[in-house]
C-alpha cells in the first residue's frame, strides 16, 4: 500500500495555540506510520508557516509539562525562542505531494472556516467540517439559532456586539431583559477552551465581565446558567454519522474553565455519563440532530447541560476540531465506543477523501 502524505497543521493564531500543539502531538503519535507519512506544519501566533525542522522539534517539546510548571506565557516564549534559534525561513516549503491535510488548529483561524477555505482553494482534502459548518459552529450565537430551529432547547440569553458595548455600555446594560435569571455566563462568541468566559452572580459584576469579553471578541453572549450535568457526545462520520456514549464532566472549580482543563487538571470525567439510559439516548439523538442541522462532516463534539431530575436537555456548544490531548473527551469517548486512537485517525483521514453528497433523509 502506497503511503499517504498527511500535512499536520498545528499552532495557529488563536488563544488555544499551545493546546493545538499538544493535540497535534497526540495525533502524530497515533497515526499509523505504515500507512501515512506525516509532514508537520507549524503556524506561529503571527501567522508564519514552518515545516519539517522546527515543526518537528516543536512536536517533540513537552509543552504540556511546561504549561503546568511555568504557565502558558512561558510556553509561548519558549516557542518563539525555538523558532528564532532555528534560523528557518517561513513559507519555505511546498504543498506539492500533500495528499490530505489534518488541521488541528483550535479556535480562530483554524476552526472557523478560514483554513478550510484555503485548503478548498488549493484542492487539498482535509479532515473535519467544511467552510460553512466550521463558520457556523464557531459562532456560538449562530449555532444556537440553528439548533433551536431544529427543535433542540438552548439556554436563554442575549447577544452583545463589542462595538455597541464600546459606544454605549449604559444602553447595553439597560437593554438586558429582566427575565434573565442570575447567575449568568458571559462568553466571547468565537473563542473556545472556555477562554474569556466569566461567571456573573449579580448584575453589578456584569460590566467588568462584558468589558473583558468584548476585549477578546467582536461578539459576546450573555447566557443564563443552566442547572445539571455537563455532558459531551463525540460524533464521527459524514452522511451517516455515529454518536458515542455520553461523557460527563465534573468540574474541579466553579465551572469547567481553561485552567481546569489544561493546567490544574482537576476535573473528573465519567464515561459513560451517570445518566439513566433513556436520557442518555435522548442526548445522543440531539447530538446527531445538531450535527446534521449545522451541516457537519468528519467529526465534532457536541456539548449539553442535562438536568437529570427534570429530564431537560439543553444545547451548550459544538466543537468541530475538538481537543485531541491525552485528557480530551473526544478520543476517550471514541475509545469507549471501540475506536482506538490510531483507528480514529485513520477513519478521519478516510472520511476526508469521501466526496460530499446530499444527506440521507
UniProtKB/Swiss-Prot annotation:
Family matches, as Pfam families: Dala_Dala_lig_C, Dala_Dala_lig_N
Q: Which GO terms describe its cellular component?
A: cytosol
Name of the protein: D-alanine--D-alanine ligase
Please give the InterPro entries that the UniProt record associates with this protein. Answer: ATP-grasp, ATP_grasp_subdomain_1, D-Ala_lig_Van_CS, D_ala_D_ala, Dala_Dala_lig_C, Dala_Dala_lig_N, PreATP-grasp_dom_sf
Q: In which pathway does it act?
A: Cell wall biogenesis; peptidoglycan biosynthesis
SUPFAM superfamilies according to UniProt: Glutathione synthetase ATP-binding domain-like (SSF56059), PreATP-grasp domain (SSF52440)
- The first-level EC class reads ligase
Q: What is the residue range of the signal peptide feature? A: none
Q: Which GO terms describe its molecular function?
A: ATP binding; D-alanine-D-alanine ligase activity; metal ion binding
**Which key words are in the record?**
ATP-binding, Cell shape, Cell wall biogenesis/degradation, Cytoplasm, Ligase, Magnesium, Manganese, Metal-binding, Nucleotide-binding, Peptidoglycan synthesis
| List of residues binding ATP | 177-232
User: What's the record's note on cofactor binding?
Assistant: Binds 2 magnesium or manganese ions per subunit.
- The EC number(s) this enzyme carries: 6.3.2.4
Reaction catalysed by this enzyme? 2 D-alanine + ATP = D-alanyl-D-alanine + ADP + phosphate + H(+)
Biological-process GO terms, alphabetical: cell wall organization; peptidoglycan biosynthetic process; regulation of cell shape
Q: Which protein family is it in?
A: Belongs to the D-alanine--D-alanine ligase family.
Q: Which organism is it from?
A: Chlorobium phaeovibrioides (strain DSM 265 / 1930) (Prosthecochloris vibrioformis (strain DSM 265))
Give start and end of each ATP-grasp domain.
144-350
The places in or outside the cell where this protein is found are: Cytoplasm
This molecule's function is given as: Cell wall formation.
Give the source's domain of life in one word: Bacteria
Residues binding Mg(2+) 1: 303, 317
Residues recorded as binding Mg(2+) 2, renumbered to this chain, are 317, 319
Cofactor(s) required, per the database record: Mg(2+); Mn(2+)
Q: Which NCBIfam families match?
A: D_ala_D_alaTIGR, PRK01372.1, PRK01966.1-4
